[in-house]
Amino acid sequence: MGPSASHLRLPLGFVFLWAFPDKTFGLGYATASGKGRLDGGSPTKGFLGSVAAGPMESVFHSWAGQAWADRLFMLGLLGVGAALLAGIGVRLAAAAGTVMMALMWLAEWPPARHLSDGSPSMSSNPFAHYHLVYALALVAPAATGAGTTWGLGRLWARVPWLSRNRRLR
């Protein structure tokens, strides 16, 4: 499944990596121009601050805009994206990306019909959500060693200390 999983690894890597410059510079895609990190914007404030349902609502509101949350989120986008695209550290990147996506899914969970204020949530599905799909999709490249196809995974695996630490491949 190596080539098939690489077909998945590369676009997933691009999804994560692209978000980094967009959120850093405010390129006008998910992050409006003038709202990037370099302009003083917070990559977590909008998403986490707008959580409007679920048992974790107050927790995510307290994390929104916090410096530690912004730094971890940006580091995650850059690290997961670069590792997946390069094909190195795919297992570690997949684990980190899965945790990130699971937390983002949890922030929007439950995909209820109504928000905590009673207004409609506009949720289209009671379970499946794109963050959950991304989290599950990250498992395939990690499980199949997809970094060796169209990536630097073979060279990475030859590094002596990595041969003893398979989780870092």
List where the protein language model places each region:
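Extended, low-polarity transmembrane helix blocks
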Residues: 1-51, 55-79, 86-169
